Amino acid sequence: MKLLSITLTSIVISMVFYQTPITTEARSLRKTNDQDHFKAGFTDDFVPTSPGNSPGVGHKKGNVNVEGFQDDFKPTEGRKLLKTNVQDHFKTGSTDDFAPTSPGHSPGVGHKKGNVNVESSEDDFKHKEGRKLQQTNGQNHFKTGSTDDFAPTSPGNSPGIGHKKGHANVKGFKDDFAPTEEIRLQKMNGQDHFKTGSTDDFAPTTPGNSPGMGHKKGDDFKPTTPGHSPGVGHAVKNDEPKA
């Protein structure tokens, strides 16, 4: 008997809930500021709205004319505010604020170009002729100029940056680095000393025995008896004991 009662109760409850609709339409609430508020529904809440005028999530789009705002983002003409130092200031506008200006004369962002003559400044970066200042030791000094400041100079005689070449005869020094003939100095103890020369100073020598720069190689480095080296730059004498 108890089982029958439970079964009948379950059937009645199922019939009641079976007739209840699964989805319900949105229930209109209170209308505020010409906007229809809905608790839930199938309205297209996220359709595009005019800039700065979004009704918010859950609000009906209403009668917003989106097409009327399609040109809101086009450039608008600048509104002139105040004129300072022959420059027209604009709050906003479609003027060419970033046009090229003469060097050192930028009107700044948001300023109209004014009457800047860019064409007259096109040659500002050309070389200007140097202004002669003072002559020292036969060298002409210039503050700036288009002279050939970095032309080759004679060895040990560089005029420095900004100095004119002067009368340096570069062609006359073309052989300065050619080998010069050796100059014999004083002869001491039967040994010949040389200041410089065109000899092959850097010929291969035995390890640890370099004659040094400016010394004639001669036969200085013939094998000698232990403890009897003639020294660097000294010519060897043929007084070695013969084997």
Swiss-Prot record:
UniProt gene name: CEP9
Chain spans, region Disordered: 42-63, 91-173, 189-243
Propeptide regions on this chain: 28-44, 60-96, 112-148, 164-200, 216-219, 235-243
Classification of source organism: Eukaryota, Viridiplantae, Streptophyta, Embryophyta, Tracheophyta
Name by which UniProt lists this protein: Precursor of CEP9
Signal peptide: 1-26
An individual GO BP term: response to potassium ion
Coiled-coil boundaries: none
Function per UniProt: Extracellular signaling peptide that represses primary root growth rate and significantly inhibits lateral root formation. Modulates leaf morphology. Regulates systemic nitrogen (N)-demand signaling. Mediates up-regulation of genes involved in N uptake and assimilation pathways.
Family: Belongs to the C-terminally encoded plant signaling peptide (CEP) family.
Entry's Gene Ontology molecular function annotations: hormone activity
Tissue specificity statement from the Swiss-Prot or TrEMBL entry: Expressed in lateral root primordia and in lateral roots excluding the meristem region. Also present in the aerial tissues, such as leaf petioles and the shoot apex region.
Record organism: Arabidopsis thaliana (Mouse-ear cress)
Subunit description: Interacts with CEP receptors (e.g. CEPR1 and CEPR2).
